[in-house]
Amino acid sequence: MKKKYYITISLIVAIAILIIDQVTKRIIATTMNIGDSYEVIPNFLNITSHRNNGAAWGILSGKMGFFYIITIVILIVLVLFYIKEAKYNLFMQVAISLLFAGALGNFIDRLVNGEVVDFVDTNIFGYDFPIFNVADSSLTIGVLFIIIALLKDANSKE
């Protein structure tokens, strides 16, 4: 019999991502000055200490009140979506857990520091991609998983 909710797996995913996110940000914040950069893979990956008081790519910079409200709303919506729409679907539940952990990780930064610590600095095919962190990666992967789950669900109904 299929389980309705995979709470243990969902919690393990969310807590693991949250811990990795917060620990890596703490390491960067306490061991590097803003702007310091270390090359990891030449012409591809650097660890660069950066702060962002906006959203992705620095949009809405300095609008912390907005981010507090919207993040709380998003976290509530994710919990409701998990309960109502992700029954019996482990893949969807993991996707929601990734989104929840990513949103919560950056929310903690904004709440505690008034800004988000970013440090993964990539250059992909000559494009200097905006600096990001583990929470941002979790959000991106979570969105991709949601899209895959929705497409798979739509195809199975045809």
Swiss-Prot record:
Pfam families: Peptidase_A8
Localization per record: Cell membrane
GO cellular component: plasma membrane
Membrane topology term: Multi-pass membrane protein
Domain of life per record: Bacteria
Pathway the protein takes part in: Protein modification; lipoprotein biosynthesis (signal peptide cleavage)
GO molecular function terms attached to this record: aspartic-type endopeptidase activity
GO biological process, any: proteolysis
Keywords, comma-separated and alphabetical: Aspartyl protease, Cell membrane, Hydrolase, Membrane, Protease, Transmembrane, Transmembrane helix
Function: This protein specifically catalyzes the removal of signal peptides from prolipoproteins.
Stored PANTHER family: LIPOPROTEIN SIGNAL PEPTIDASE
Protein name: Lipoprotein signal peptidase
Organism of provenance: Staphylococcus haemolyticus (strain JCSC1435)
Gene name of the record: lspA
